[in-house]
Amino acid sequence: LEKEECLEREEWITLLSACGDEKLRDYAAQKARTVAQGGFGTDIYVRGLIEFSNYCKNDCYYCGIRRSNPGADRYRLSMEDILACCEEGWILGFRTFVLQGGEDGFYRDEWYEELIREIKRKYPACAITLSVGERTKETYRRWYEAGADRYLLRHETADDAHYRTMHPEEMSPVHRKECLYALKEIGYQVGCGFMVGSPGQGPEQLAQDMEFIHELKPHMVGIGPFVPAAGTPFAKETQGSLELTIFMLSLLRLQEKRVLLPATTALGTIHPLGREMGIQAGANVV
């Protein structure tokens, strides 16, 4: 994998099925750490994440902010709130702002344009990353022309049948992938990603994820363990494995050597040193 940067489907399944072997996981982590340090040195990239809304029109079965969750404590930040976060972040040394929210129709496309332009006016040296779900290609283009640099849209699973078990029928796995290709075509630096250990996922599904990422060639890949959320159909499902998530980070680093690979929030949620373990296994963003 380190040499060829891809595997055949059956090779992936064999490798992923061996995740229970601690020596194999440690070997993969050591190789991935060497690759990461060879490409990036010991630098870790720090991002300022602003979660500005947890309203969402979608009803994904795993997500705590799904529209049908009556227990979600909803909030929205104003443009002034967000700009205040950016000001504080800039003073602290953040140079990338990640604006993340649910697919919330309260904010119009024009509002995003104004926000992006204002952040860029105040902090012309910053990078703006958006993570606000599936939109039209025209909307993506408008935001890019306003100054947005990057876009994060997790594909969640590359297996279409698996996708349909985690989302209501009005959501399309094909459309989600089309959004990622449209974002790349427009010129964004693009991030995709998936949950590790989601219900119904096995080596076959993870193999398809690795193949899709190899084909897409994203600039960033965000993965994290599945964490059951209260008030969702998957609330009582088993949490994703820390060991498998760390292993997947290592394999991603070996396949996509120059990709930006975060040690995500969910890793820190399931283990107090989860993020540090992710960095030791090839991640390079927090």
Placement of each model-derived feature along the sequence:
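Flexible, acidic/Gly-rich N-terminal and inter-domain linker regions that tether
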Residues: 1-58
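Core AdoMet radical
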Residues: 67-82, 89-110, 115-116, 120-180, ...
